[in-house]
Swiss-Prot record:
UniProt KW keywords: Growth factor, Nucleus, Phosphoprotein
Motif Nuclear localization signal in this chain: 135-147
Source organism superkingdom: Eukaryota
Name of the protein described by the UniProt record: Hepatoma-derived growth factor-related protein 3
GO CC, alphabetical: cytoplasm; cytosol; nucleoplasm; nucleus
Basic and acidic residues composition bias: residue spans: 168-177
Pfam families: PWWP (PF00855)
SMART domains: PWWP
Gene Ontology MF term list: chromatin binding; growth factor activity; microtubule binding; tubulin binding
Biased composition (Basic residues): 134-159
GO biological process: microtubule polymerization; negative regulation of microtubule depolymerization; neuron projection development
InterPro entries noted in UniProt: PWWP_dom
């Protein structure tokens, strides 16, 4: 099917929006709230159904919802996609709740501080908008765990009596945090050496 020429959209138009790494997502051309970051030239503020994320996209990445419903409107395993299909059909006027909380914050800050709230609310808004669908990407990364140095300590300590070692653990943590700036490798070696000395002392 030939791709249509980019067209003009207005606030409230329902579309499928395409972002790299994601399927064509059910979305709406959004109106800009007061104090929000202005979009770059030739880009529209987009509200994604299902996830309630926002982004700025050009007309070449937008497809009219009614015309492309059969092509892109099939259910998908992607988190939030099926909810988005339901929302665009049953609740197309759903609002992004973050706008309301930002407006409430800015009005309370104006009363309390007397002024510079437009900058604060636009910064918060800008972070959300710049992320676009970034939160969905980061959800995968959030479940990863970082390795910690405590796994070596706990395996050695589990061989010793737990009651005596609790006090030593606290002292070792204090020593470790108060030690003068060394690199992470030296800190680990010192901790291991301290454990060996502590084991010999008991």
């Amino acid at each position: 099917m030939a791709r249509p020429r980019p067209r003009e959209y207005k606030a409230g138009d329902l579309v499928f929006a395409k972002m790299k790494g994601y399927p064509h997502w059910p979305a709406r051309i959004d109106e800009l709230p007061e104090g929000a970051v202005k979009p770059p030239a030739n880009k529209y503020p987009i509200f994604f159904f299902g996830t309630h994320e926002t982004a700025f996209l050009g007309p070449k990445d937008l497809f009219p919802y009614k015309e492309y419903k059969d092509k892109f409107g099939k259910s998908n395993k992607r988190k939030g996609f099926n909810e988005g299909l339901w929302e665009i059909e049953n609740n197309p006027g759903v609002k992004f709740t973050g706008y309301q909380t930002i407006q409430q914050q800015s009005s309370s800050e104006t009363e309390g501080e007397g002024g510079n709230t437009a900058d604060a609310s636009s910064e918060e808004e800008g972070d959300r908008v710049e992320d676009g669908k970034g939160k969905r990407k980061n959800e995968k990364g959030g479940s990863k765990r970082k390795k910690s140095y405590t796994s070596k300590k706990s395996s050695k300590q589990s061989r010793k009596s737990p009651g005596d070692e609790d006090d030593k653990d606290c002292k070792e943590e204090e020593n470790k945090s108060s030690s003068e700036g060394g690199d992470a490798g030296n800190d680990t070696r010192n901790t291991t050496a301290d454990l060996q000395k502590a084991g010999e002392g008991t």
